[in-house]
């Protein structure tokens, strides 16, 4: 797990344990070494500075302890797949996320 300028908000009292499973959408196989990036989001939808970056293990799994309750932006990036990004409301002691990454779309051009 890599911390990126962890804001003070990460140390709030109500905290959750997050589990991630990153899979290939086309065959359901795990994605190893994918970056799972976590950013807090304020009530106006603005992303806070700092955050955390996790890496998935060979089984496509990653976890994080100590996420404060509130809105969280989760992004998953890895070469060869479309970037996943979505906001989630963290409001329970434990959350599990199954993220299915899609292959990149074909690029279309008018130039030859």
Residue ranges and their predicted role:
Residues 2-18, 23-25, 29, 96-112:
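Beta-strand-rich domain onsets/edges
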Residues 52, 62, 86, 95-97:
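Short strand-edge motifs at loop-to-beta-strand transitions and within beta-strands
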Residues 58, 68-69:
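Surface-exposed loops/turns
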Residues 16, 26-44:
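Short, ordered, surface-exposed loop/turn motifs in non-cytosolic proteins
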Residues 71, 75-88:
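A short, solvent-exposed loop/turn motif at the edges and junctions
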Residues 15, 69-71, 81, 94:
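Extracellular Ig-like/FN3 beta-sandwich strand-entry sites
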Residues 67, 91-93, 102:
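Hydrophobic loop/turn residues within beta-sheet-rich immunoglobulin-like superfamily modules
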Residues 43-61:
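Short, acidic Ser/Thr/Gly-rich low-complexity loop/linker segments typical of extracellular
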């Amino acid at each position: 797990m890599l911390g990126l300028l962890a804001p003070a908000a990460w140390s709030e009292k109500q905290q959750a344990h997050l589990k991630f499973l990153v899979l290939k959408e086309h065959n359901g196989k795990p994605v190893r070494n994918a970056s799972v990036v976590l950013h807090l989001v304020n009530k106006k939808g603005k992303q806070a500075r700092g955050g955390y970056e996790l890496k998935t293990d060979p089984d496509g799994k990653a976890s994080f302890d100590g996420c404060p309750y509130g809105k969280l932006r989760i992004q998953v990036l890895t070469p060869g797949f479309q970037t996943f990004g979505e906001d989630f409301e963290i409001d329970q002691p434990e959350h599990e996320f199954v993220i299915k990454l899609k292959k990149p779309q074909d690029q279309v051009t008018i130039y030859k």
